[in-house]
Amino acid sequence: MENSPRYREATNLIPSPRCHNSNNSCGMSSSSESNKPPTTPTRHVTTRSESGNPYPTTFVQADTSSFKQVVQMLTGSAERPKHGSSLKPNPTHHQPDPRSTPSSFSIPPIKAVPNKKQSSSSASGFRLYERRNSMKNLKINPLNPVFNPVNSAFSPRKPEILSPSILDFPSLVLSPVTPLIPDPFDRSGSSNQSPNELAAEEKAMKERGFYLHPSPATTPMDPEPRLLPLFPVTSPRVSGSSSASTS
C-alpha cells in the first residue's frame, strides 16, 4: 500500500516541519500553485553596482501604461505634492531599494543665522545715506538761532559776533584784501612809456596790425646762433683723400 500512487501524493502534501516553523502558509503553497492560473511576470527592479561606484545603475522592467509612474516613483523627491500623495502605488510594483534612491540622501535645510557684521554694515550704510541726504539739503544761515554758538558745538565764541568765521568752516572764512599795486608781471613797460611812444604804438597797431614794443637797451643780447650746413658742400671721403695726398 505504501507503493500506491495515492499514498505518494498524500505524503507529498504533508508540510515539512521546517516550513511550518517559518511560515504557516507555505505548507499549502504546493497545492495552491497547481490550482492557480498562469500569471504575467511581475515587474522587478534589478540593481547593478560596480565596485567603487557610489551611484549604482538601476534597471526597471515596466510596460507603457505604468512607465511614467515608475519613473516618478524612482526619481521623485521625498516631499511630494498633495495631489500626488493621494495616489496609491500599484501593489504589483516592487518598491525600489531606498539606498539606491536619491531621496534617502536628503540634505536638511540650513538655518539662516543673522550675521552681526552684515547687520552692522547695513545700519552704518543707512546712517551714511541719511547723512548724505541731510548734507544735500543743508542751508547755513548765521542769523538762525540753530547756528548759535551757545546751542551748537562749532565755536565757543560770543553770540554777538555774526560772521561766517563763527562756524569754523575754512570755505566761509573771508579772504584777505589784496592792495592795488602795479602788476609785477607786466613786462610791456606801458607805465614807463611817454605819450609820444603810446601814440606811435597805437598808430602802428592801426596801420600794421601789431604791437610796437621797443626792447630796452639794457637787455643783454645773445650772440647770433651758429648755422650748421644742412647739406655739406664737400664729401668727407674727398676731403680725407685730399688731405692724405698732401701729406
UniProtKB/Swiss-Prot annotation:
Phosphorylated on serine and threonine residues by MPK6 following treatment with the pathogen-associated molecular pattern (PAMP) flg22. MAP kinase-mediated phosphorylation after PAMP elicitation causes degradation of VQ4, allowing WRKY33 to promote transcription from defense genes. A motif (VQ) lies at residues 67-76. Residues 200-210 have a biased composition (Basic and acidic residues). It comes from the Eukaryota. The modification Phosphoserine is found at S16, S106, S155, S163, S165, S175, S194, S215, S235, S239, S243. Residues 21-37 have a biased composition (Low complexity). Keywords: Nucleus, Phosphoprotein, Plant defense. Its main location: nucleus. The modification Phosphothreonine is found at T178, T219, T234. InterPro entries: VQ, VQ_4/11/13/19/31/33. GO terms for biological process: defense response; negative regulation of cellular defense response; negative regulation of DNA-binding transcription factor activity. PANTHER family: VQ MOTIF-CONTAINING PROTEIN 11-LIKE, VQ MOTIF-CONTAINING PROTEIN 13-RELATED. Acts as a negative regulator of WRKY33 transcription factor activity in the promotion of defense gene expression. Acts as a negative regulator of pathogen-associated molecular pattern (PAMP)-induced responses to modulate resistance to pathogens. Interacts with MPK3 and MPK6. This is VQ motif-containing protein 4. It comes from Arabidopsis thaliana. The gene is VQ4.
